[in-house]
Structures are given as C-alpha cells and as structure tokens.
Amino acid sequence: MAMNDNNYVIFKVNDLYCALSCLEVQEIIRDTKHITQIPQSDDSVSGVINIRGKIVTVINLPKHFNLDFNKSGTDSIIVVNDDNECIGLYVSEVIDVIDVNDIEIEHTPAVPHQLDPHFVKGVMEFEKEITAVLNLPEILNVETAETE
C-alpha cells in the first residue's frame, strides 16, 4: 500500500483504540526487548533503543496518558519523527494500517474519557470501536506533559 495522508496506523494503548497518520510514522518495531532503561528518568519514559546506530527515546504511552501499564506479548514501538528527531512510542499493540477519508474523522469530538483532550485531534470508528486520532505534537510537547 502506498502511504498517503489518508493512511492511519491503528493501535491500542491498553484497551483504548488510537490512530496516527502514516505521514507521522517512520517505522514500527515489534521487538521491545532491547529497551535500555535510564535511571532517574521521567516515569513515562521507558528508556532508549538503538535503531541502526541511532539512539531513540521511547515514551511509554500508557504511563504518559496516566493509565495503568499492562505489558503484553503484542507490545510494539511506533517510531515517529518530531522536528528531525526520532521518538519511539511504546504501545500495547499495532493492529492495522487503514485508509480513512477526512469526513470520517470528527474533529470536535467527545474525547474518550481516559485521555486528556489536548492529546486528541479527532475521533473515528474502526471495527465498531471509537478510535482517538492522536495529536502527536501535543503528546510530544514537554510543557503539556508536565502540567498533566
């Protein structure tokens, strides 16, 4: 599938269905065993991982969203690019890549109750599940995260 601005990666953060535009995603890493923890780092930072010689910080999205962290056998890291810096997002499971028309995304949504409204830019439906389209710049914004 050729990636375009209508493609979204669907994934779970615990039991929450979430989505990111494929234009924001660099790659998906399914092997999470090689994360090196950083002593005295923020609770929402899982650690760092070496990706082809590049050190990437990994943010634990359940902890970042103030949710319980339940490790599963399907955990993955979604690597995103933020201002030419790679950041890994630790998620519970990557489910699919789908094509979505803009009209399918409600941009003034009622946000799933577990998520801070700043982290969500819209909602859509995926397999009858309300799916939060995440606002990546806000998730990666340190100031927003510190005020939560």
Tell what function each PLM region has.
Residues 1-148:
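An acidic, low-aromatic, low-complexity terminal/linker signal
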